[in-house]
């Protein structure tokens, strides 16, 4: 889809799309999306890949646009991390109360 929208070939954008879906290695179901499929994940991807990528046609393409399109394609909108985690119970270990020194 990125190549159809922005030109070039799919391989021009594969590294970015693979980055978003890399969390499947840790959590191989739809919950993997909670890790990067959010406004914060898009911010992180822009830090990793830069503001633009240059496709094989020499055209500069916004990384933010590519990432937003990926998340919208998967979820229909761009959630915030707060939206992902608002119903997640807070466990005692999350505050470091179970640290072993």
Predicted regions, residues:
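N-terminal membrane-targeting hydrophobic helices
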Residues: 1-101
């Amino acid at each position: 889809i990125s190549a159809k929208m922005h030109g070039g070939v799919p391989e021009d954008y594969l590294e970015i799309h693979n980055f978003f879906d890399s969390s499947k290695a840790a959590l191989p179901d739809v919950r993997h999306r909670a890790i990067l499929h959010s406004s914060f994940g898009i911010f992180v991807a822009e830090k990793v890949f830069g503001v633009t990528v240059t496709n094989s046609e020499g055209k500069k393409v916004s990384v933010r646009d590519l990432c937003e399109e990926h998340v919208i394609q998967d979820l229909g909108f761009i959630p915030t991390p707060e939206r992902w985690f608002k119903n997640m119970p807070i466990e005692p270990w999350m505050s470091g109360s179970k640290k072993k020194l």
